[in-house]
Amino acid sequence: MVMKLAPYGVFCLTARTFSGIGFDAFLPLLKYMAGVMTALAIQGLVVYMAILKGFTGLSPVRFLKKFLPVMGFAFSTATSNATIPMSIDTLNKKMGVSKQISSFTIPLGATINMDGTSIMQGVAVIFIAEAYGIHLTPANLATVVVTATLASIGTAGIPSVGLVTLAMVLNSVGLPTEGIALIMGIDRILDMLRTAVNITGDAVCTTIVSHQEKALNREVFNRN
């Protein structure tokens, strides 16, 4: 009952805050969201697709068209683990990827390949540092890159787990973990997006491995 009513309570509190302090107070959060969304879009639609094309010669457009339902499911559930069966089935039946390979790489990727989470944490650290007026040196930024990467490896594929590991990243550069509260209210939307990016990366890597192992049926992939 509490979980069902909580969103309404949060909405009322947000509406009250909005009416009291105005729209300007939300501009930094909107910029943060825009920054994360832009980075995720570049990773999912540019970087991954360029890697797919470069290593396999397959059409990125056809790949996205066939994998879009899986991305939509991942977006709605915000969990990589729940998407595993659908990813394996889609790769096998619609893209010609070996099920023997996908049954290994997709669950593995759902555990260690959290690019979207790393991206969010990098942007979040910069946002929180600016909110507290703390300057980050190049050495601090390098530490964030390494820590965010390590924190994403082995992270459970469940909703909002990135906020939990973000605390470790903040501690690595001496930022207050209380800053997580600044972005907690809007993280659900970003969590859904980064989950879609994460599982897309898993699928791209699986397709590449299947191609390199000569276990990719191109006729199935090119079939409408």
Which residues make up each language-model segment?
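Loop-to-transmembrane-helix entry motif
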Residues: M1-L5, L29-M37, F67, M71, ...
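Membrane-interfacial loop-to-helix junctions in multi-pass transporters
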Residues: M1-L5, T38-L40, T56-F63, M95-S102, ...
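Signature of multi-pass transmembrane helix bundles
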Residues: M1-R62, E219, R223-N224
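Alpha-helical transmembrane segments and their lipid-water interface positions
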Residues: M3-F11, V47, T117-Q121, R194-T195, ...
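Small-residue-enriched core segments of transmembrane alpha-helices in multipass membrane transport
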Residues: L30-V47, K66-F73, L141-T155, T165-L170, ...
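Juxtamembrane helix-loop transition segments at the membrane interface in multi-pass membrane proteins
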Residues: G54-K65, L91-M95, L170, V209-S210, ...
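Helix-loop-helix junctions within the multi-pass membrane cores of secondary transporters/permeases
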Residues: P69-S152, T206, R218-N224
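Transmembrane alpha-helical segments and their short flanking loops
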Residues: G122-N224
